[in-house]
Design a protein with these regions (language model features):
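N-terminal alpha-helical targeting/anchoring segments
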Residues: 1-134, 152, 156
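TRNA-recognition modules of translation machinery and tRNA-sensing kinases, especially anticodon-binding
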Residues: 129-436
Length: 436
């Protein structure tokens, strides 16, 4: 969440930065400040009354010693009344704080000054392009046709099992998916210096709040509604991304400065209830409710936040370069950024069968927005102060769309798919053949 002190001290700056998102969130600032002022006023009055109660209580003993019992009883009544008022003020302050913090959770992060101003994806500036679009001397197939011809995915049976938006990988398709997962994890762990973790696939509500998924995007999550432990029903969720558990690993902790940066990579399936647009994207693999992803998370010193973001983007780019895929990197404009992000780069891979770019990685620096929600801090060595680190997240990468781009790019005239060299040891083959 945003720093309350920043809202008080630089109110117009906060409003101006929020306004660049074009979502109307700046309108919430006045309400947050009003609740904050109500809380502070109640606490200030309560402190004054506590001091008065203490001094009055001391007077009572002297009055009793002087046998001025009527006056002592009057003072006792005054102390009781002060106590009742203090209790009332404490309750008012607590209610105002709860309402203020609930509103704060609904306000997104402030875009970094380097982020381009814009309304939507059409305003996202292109940063760089790698490689050339695949060209063919034959009429290429799209991924749905390839998956059906090579029996990589059984779309019909996936839908039969779980409904639309769910995939059943089969044969070479299942093996290719597993090969990609292992390749990605090994690359990030061995070459890029990330520590691999294997998180739970069900997370608590506090984890979703910590990364900014909740409360705003609660309707896009799959909640666990039944089970043996009735106390958790409706409070546990299938993870929408491994960011939810992995970024929260050190919540409520104070790390040593020398521990930074902390870098994790994790594989997980991801579950999202959001609906896709009708058409090939819905029928195929472009928009699905469950997909695999390797997530990258960094906890870094604020001074290194943006340097580490550039490194993370290059880590994700390496995946596509090794697999021989054409892609571009774009910088999301203020109106297209995610809720918790201060700056985001998207990496979009070219899918020749779709004739378009597909997002396979989104890398963001959330600055201290998430660490404040998690109360994750580090102790600065120079003065012992506890500070909030920057939290970075990125896809390294998402698998479904990577799968699409790979099979469409590396298809061959005979209908087979050439396996990129880095995947061959994992797959045990250099070609995925036509199904018999």
């Amino acid at each position: 969440m945003l720093d309350m002190k920043l809202l008080r001290d630089r109110t117009e700056f906060v409003r101006e930065r929020l306004a660049t998102r074009n979502a109307g969130d700046e309108a919430r600032v006045s309400e947050v400040l009003a609740l904050d002022e109500s809380r502070r006023a109640a606490l200030a009055e309560a402190e004054q009354l506590k001091a008065r109660r203490n001094s009055t209580s001391k007077e009572i003993g002297g009055l009793i010693g002087q046998k001025r019992l009527d006056e002592a009883e009057s003072k006792k009544a005054e102390v009781r009344a002060l106590g009742d008022r203090i209790t009332e003020l404490d309750k008012t302050a607590a209610q105002a704080e709860e309402s203020r913090d609930s509103l704060l959770l609904m306000i997104p992060n402030l875009p970094h000054a380097s982020v381009a101003l814009g309304k939507d994806a059409a305003d996202n500036p292109e940063i760089r392009v790698h490689g050339q679009k695949a060209s063919f001397e034959f009429t290429p197939y799209n991924h749905v046709e390839l998956c059906e011809r090579l029996k990589l995915i059984d779309f019909a049976r996936g839908a039969k099992l779980s409904g639309s938006g769910f995939l059943l990988y089969t044969g070479w398709g299942a093996r290719l998916e597993r090969a990609l997962i292992n390749f990605l994890l090994d690359l990030h762990q061995r070459e890029h210096g990330y520590t691999e973790v294997a998180p739970p696939y069900i997370v608590g509500e506090h984890c979703m709040i910590g990364v900014g998924q909740f409360p705003k995007f609660r309707d896009q999550a799959y909640a666990v509604q039944e089970g043996l432990d009735t106390s958790t029903m409706g409070k546990l969720y299938l993870l929408p991304t491994a960011e939810a558990p992995v970024a929260n690993i050190h919540r409520e902790e104070i790390l040593a400065e020398k521990q930074l940066p902390v870098c994790y990579c994790a594989y997980s399936p991801c579950f999202r209830a959001e609906a896709g647009a009708a058409g090939l994207g819905t029928r195929g693999m472009i928009r699905v409710h469950q997909f695999d992803k390797v997530e990258l998370i960094k906890v870094v010193h604020p001074d290194q936040g943006y340097e580490e973001l550039e490194k993370m983007v290059h880590n994700a780019e390496t995946v596509l370069q090794r697999l021989g895929l054409h892609y571009r990197v774009i910088n999301l404009c203020t109106g297209d950024m995610g809720f918790a992000a201060a700056k985001t780069y998207d990496i979009e891979v070219w899918a020749p069968g779709q004739g378009t770019y597909l997002e396979v990685s989104s890398c963001s620096n959330c600055e201290d927005y998430q660490s404040r929600r998690m109360n994750l801090r580090f102790k600065r060595e120079s003065d012992g102060l506890n500070l909030f680190p920057h939290l970075l997240n990125g896809s390294g990468t998402a698998l479904a769309r990577l799968f699409v781009a790979l099979v469409e790019t590396h298809q061959q005239a005979d209908g087979s798919i050439r396996v990129p060299e880095p995947l061959q040891p994992y797959l045990g083959a250099d070609v995925i053949p036509l199904a018999s």
